Amino acid sequence: MKLKGTTIVALGMLVVAIMVLASMIDLPGSDMSATPAPPDTPRGAPIVGGQGQAMGLPVAMQRRRGEQRAPVPALSDANGGFVAPNVQFSEAHWQGMEALPLSIELKRKLKLPLDLEGLLIDETSLNAAVSGLLAGDVLVAINGRKVKTLKKMQKETRRVQMDRRASLTVYRKGRLLTLTLSEEKNLGLAQVETAPMILPGDIMPHPYRGPCTQCHAIGTTGHITPDPDGIVLPPGPIRAGAKMPHRDRGPCAACHAIIQ
C-alpha cells in the first residue's frame, strides 16, 4: 500500500510531538532529571539534598587523618600591623629609671661577669637618680626578690606599687649595693615596652638576635615618620652685622637671608 505525501508529513509531525512531550515528563528513575544546586552552606556544615538527606561535607573541609590546621602566626593591631603573639619586652620604666634585658651581648660589651643576672640600667632621672642609681648599674633585686627579666621586674613592682619606698640591690663595679627608692605618694608600677615597630624589609641595625618579630611589630603606624628629633629646620633670617651665635661655619649668606 502506498502512502500519500500528506500522510507521511502528518506521521512525522506526530512523532516530533511525542518526543517533545516525553522530554517534558520526569519519569521515575530517569537519568534525564536535573539535580538542583545545593544552597549556600555554612563552612563545615553538611550539604543537604532536596529531600533533606545528608550528601557529605564540602570538599574544602575534608582533611586527611592526622592533618592539622596551620596555627595563626600573628595578631594584628587595630591598624593592621603584624604583632607576634609572644613578643618580648625590650625595656621598662619605673620612677625615672630605664631598664634593659642584660643579654650576653651586653655583658661582653660592658665587660660584666657572664654569670651576672639582672637588668641593665640604661638611664636614670627623677627619683631613681635621687636614690643614687647610676646609668650602667645592674638591678639585681627589688626588696630582696631577684629580677632577672623585665616581666619579673613588672611583677615585683606590682607588689610595691602602693608603697612609698623599696630597697634596690644593684651591681656596680664588682660590688653589690643596697639603695632606697622613695616617692612621697606611692611608687607605682613599672611600665614595659617592646622594641619599636619597624617597616617591612628594614635593614637590621644590630647583630642577628633571632627573628625580628620576637621583639618588633611590623608595620607603618607605630612611629612618626620622619622622626621629629631628626628634623632640622632651615636657619632663619638675620640682620647684617649681627653677632654670631655659633662658631664660624662659613659665609652667613650661605645659610641665612640677610636683612639690611
From Swiss-Prot:
A motif (MCR (magnetochrome) 1) lies at residues 195-218. It is an enzyme of class 1 (oxidoreductase). Its cofactor is heme. It holds the Pfam family PDZ_2. Binds 2 heme groups via the magnetochrome (MCR) motifs. Residues 86-194 are annotated as: PDZ. Heme 2 binds at H246, C252, C255, H256. Residues 1-7 are cytoplasmic. Residues 22-260 are lumenal. It is found in: Cell inner membrane. Subject to proteolytic cleavage which requires both MamE and MamO. Oxidizes Fe(2+) at alkaline pH; successively forms ferrihydrite (Fe(3+)(2)O(3) 0.5 H(2)O) then magnetite (Fe(3)O(4)) from an Fe(2+) solution. Exists in a homodimer-homotetramer equilibrium. The dimer forms a pocket of about 8 X 15 Angstroms, lined with acidic residues, which may bind 2 Fe(2+) ions. This bacteria has on average 17 elongated cubo-octahedral shaped magnetosome with a size of 64 X 57 nm which contain membrane-bound crystals of magnetite (Fe(3)O(4)). This is Multi-heme protein MamP. It comes from Magnetococcus massalia (strain MO-1).
